[in-house]
Amino acid sequence: YNTTRFTMNIAYLISAHTDPAQLRRLVLALHADAEYFVHIDAKSALSQFASALSLPNVHYIGDRVDVRWGTLREVQYQMNLIRAAVTFPRHFDRIFFLSGMDYPLWSNARITRWLEEQGDREILQGFCMDTDLIEAGQKETYTVARPAFRNVRLGILARILLRLTGYRKPMHF
């Protein structure tokens, strides 16, 4: 178990749906005094994650969401994780989003040093979708998202009709 400790309060918000052993390795590899808020996808068997969820400072988020890629359900589980962290009695200086399949490439000492160098600076990553730097395929993936219905054949037909008519959903930022 990693015993690296430092004065900055960190929360890791983790979403997992598979490989409970990897989730356990991830938590054990990161800062020992951090708090870990974990969402397990509703499609996954919770019992398989018992070992990882029983570690110190690991908080299981009981409001499970059946996450579907490209839908608002992704936002819902993230909001549940954020709510759990901001209502926790401890104040956090840094909050990180991770997947249960992630693993740190840096040592905790290097992560700590880098965070301390950042001071109060917020680190966010994003990009504007309205730019020539983004490939056309990425824009199309965004604008022609998952159809509202689940029938695959109807979804394929809908995409073909959308492409033939030239219709594009407006992008809102």
Stretch-by-stretch model annotation:
Residues 1-2:
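Intrinsic-disorder-associated, low-complexity terminal segments enriched in Asp/Asn/His/Tyr and depleted
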